[in-house]
């Protein structure tokens, strides 16, 4: 990877890390479910009319939109609104790699090797330390908020499996279409649970900071982030690109400290070291043998069982970042 692409990968990680601070800012104005609905609405329109069809069966678009959009981000926004700090949230969301491995083993019959299992155990220990850190901040509400964000990480992991089964050919187009699914059900759920008066007040009261947060999470983290990430995956193997996502909680925690005054305790620092190093152990692999398909590429076999360009089958095409994540690389942002 050349210097320019390294810079782009770091920029994407920074955009996704700071996204948690933007979410925290938007939640000071919008009710969480309404904010989630608006985030996906702004990301989907008008982009959905410009990017072309998703290139996957519609059932996967619907499932991805409901699990990733409504469930994952609904839980994340509710947890942060309930008191989960943005920096710690960015770290706990990396637990999606653990849930992805569990779901892949249970649903796809993937084998978890000893090295990967050890790394995931270290990451789980880091999440336990993060829970202690959240508990030390006081009260039962923060622990409940922590549970919501862990639930969001679990939904992240399940959506990885959906995306892997869908195998969309373009990451940005996939995200735009998935974003078109959650706005309506989330808006209805917001009216029912958060109340029409709170929603109407948030929509009719102008706040430059809230609007800026909304545009950042919709256009910056979703459209710009996935557009650049997909470009990098088209140029490099997923095993080269995916490790840069380990920088997301680094940028998330540091930006929360700088911009929101979130305390960095020794517990949160220990949790960060354990989670990031555990996911790195589980995800970073040795270079494959010369005869093997490169990581991040799917070798589609032809009728004779031959695969890839050299075998006479169809040319390999890069997996999108979510599908690569299902194989164990921590590539999911928020």
Q: What are these language model-derived features?
A:
Residues 234, 283-296:
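Membrane-interface capping segments at transmembrane-helix boundaries
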């Amino acid at each position: 990877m050349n210097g320019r692409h390294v810079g782009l990968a770091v920029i994407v990680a920074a955009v996704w890390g700071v996204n948690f601070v933007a979410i925290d800012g938007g939640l000071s104005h919008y009710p969480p479910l309404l904010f989630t609905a608006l985030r996906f609405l702004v990301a989907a329109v008008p982009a959905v009319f410009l990017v072309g069809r998703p290139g996957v069966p519609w059932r996967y678009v619907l499932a991805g939109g409901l699990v990733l959009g409504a469930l994952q981000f609904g839980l994340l926004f509710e947890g942060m609104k309930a008191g989960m700090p943005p920096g710690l949230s960015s770290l706990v969301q990396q637990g999606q790699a653990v849930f992805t491995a569990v779901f892949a083993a249970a649903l796809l019959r993937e084998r978890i090797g000893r090295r990967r299992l050890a790394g995931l155990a270290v990451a789980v220990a880091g999440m336990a330390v993060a829970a202690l850190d959240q508990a030390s901040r006081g009260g039962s509400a923060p622990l409940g908020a922590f549970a919501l964000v862990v639930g969001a990480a679990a939904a992240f992991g399940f959506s990885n499996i959906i995306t892997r089964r869908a195998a969309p050919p373009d990451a940005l187009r996939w995200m735009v279409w998935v974003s078109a699914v959650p706005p309506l059900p989330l808006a209805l759920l917001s009216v029912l649970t958060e109340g029409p008066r709170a929603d109407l007040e948030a929509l009719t009261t102008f706040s430059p900071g809230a609007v800026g947060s909304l545009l950042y999470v919709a256009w910056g983290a979703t459209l710009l982030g996935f557009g650049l990430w997909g470009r990098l995956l088209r140029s490099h193997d997923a095993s080269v690109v995916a490790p840069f996502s380990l920088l997301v909680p680094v940028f998330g925690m540091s930006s929360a400290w700088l911009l929101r005054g979130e305390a960095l305790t020794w517990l949160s620092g220990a949790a960060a070291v354990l989670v990031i190093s555990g996911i790195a152990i589980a995800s970073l692999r040795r270079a494959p043998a010369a005869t093997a398909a490169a990581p991040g590429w799917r070798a589609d076999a032809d009728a004779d069982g031959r695969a890839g360009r050299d075998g006479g089958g169809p040319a390999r095409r890069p997996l999108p970042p979510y599908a690569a994540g299902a194989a164990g690389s921590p590539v999911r942002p928020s």
